[in-house]
């Protein structure tokens, strides 16, 4: 019974014009699908693949450029920091030098004023001593004269 269903008229393996017609339909449908669907889809897939490949290449190139710029900027920042440190050190040296010069000038002025005051005091002392000597001599002479006059 199964052999009748398989090989009989209208069975699965009926070799009349149906099988070649079906084969022709499959081949024709394959060509139509290939022309209308598979080729355009294949082209879109290839275009997308090319786009992705070029995008990745551009991204890698931009990443390399960004890394290069980052290194350059780090070097510039490093040199700027070094230059700033040098400027700060020079400014500190200059301010220290100015401080020392101002201190030396102030000390010199103070020493000069002290020396001038000492000289004035010495002059006034000498003047006072000489005046006292003169007054003492006058007073001594006056006492001697009064003592002699009193005798």
From Swiss-Prot:
Q: Which residue windows are transmembrane per the record?
A: 18-38
**Topological relation to the membrane, as annotated:** Single-pass membrane protein
Which GO MF terms are attached to this record?
A: proton-transporting ATP synthase activity, rotational mechanism; proton-transporting ATPase activity, rotational mechanism
Q: Which cellular component terms (GO) are annotated to the entry?
A: plasma membrane-derived thylakoid membrane; proton-transporting ATP synthase complex
Q: Which UniProt keywords apply?
A: ATP synthesis, CF(0), Hydrogen ion transport, Ion transport, Membrane, Thylakoid, Transmembrane, Transmembrane helix, Transport
Q: Which cystines does this chain contain?
A: none
Instruction: Provide the protein's localization.
Output: Cellular thylakoid membrane
Q: Pfam families from the entry?
A: ATP-synt_B (PF00430)
Matches recorded under HAMAP family: ATP_synth_b_bprime, ATP_synth_bprime
What does the sequence similarity comment in the record state about its family? Belongs to the ATPase B chain family.
Q: How does it assemble?
A: F-type ATPases have 2 components, F(1) - the catalytic core - and F(0) - the membrane proton channel. F(1) has five subunits: alpha(3), beta(3), gamma(1), delta(1), epsilon(1). F(0) has four main subunits: a(1), b(1), b'(1) and c(10-14). The alpha and beta chains form an alternating ring which encloses part of the gamma chain. F(1) is attached to F(0) by a central stalk formed by the gamma and epsilon chains, while a peripheral stalk is formed by the delta, b and b' chains.
Q: What does this protein do?
A: F(1)F(0) ATP synthase produces ATP from ADP in the presence of a proton or sodium gradient. F-type ATPases consist of two structural domains, F(1) containing the extramembraneous catalytic core and F(0) containing the membrane proton channel, linked together by a central stalk and a peripheral stalk. During catalysis, ATP synthesis in the catalytic domain of F(1) is coupled via a rotary mechanism of the central stalk subunits to proton translocation.
Q: Which PANTHER family match?
A: ATP SYNTHASE SUBUNIT B', CHLOROPLASTIC
What NCBIfam families does the annotation carry?
Answer: PRK07353.1
- Listed name of the protein: ATP synthase subunit b'
């Amino acid at each position: 019974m199964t052999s009748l269903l398989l090989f009989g008229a209208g069975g699965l393996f009926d070799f009349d014009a149906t099988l070649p017609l079906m084969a022709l339909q499959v081949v024709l449908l394959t060509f139509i699908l290939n022309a209308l669907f598979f080729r355009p889809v294949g082209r879109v897939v290839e275009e997308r693949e090319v786009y992705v490949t070029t995008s990745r290449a551009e991204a890698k190139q931009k990443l390399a450029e960004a890394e290069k710029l980052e290194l350059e900027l780090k070097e510039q920042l490093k040199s700027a920091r070094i230059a700033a440190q040098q400027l700060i050190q020079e400014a500190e040296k200059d301010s220290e030098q100015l401080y020392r010069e101002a201190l030396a000038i102030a000390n010199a002025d103070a020493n000069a004023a002290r020396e001038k005051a000492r000289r004035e005091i010495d002059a006034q002392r000498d003047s006072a001593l000489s005046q006292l000597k003169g007054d003492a001599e006058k007073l001594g002479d006056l006492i001697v004269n009064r003592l002699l006059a009193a005798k």
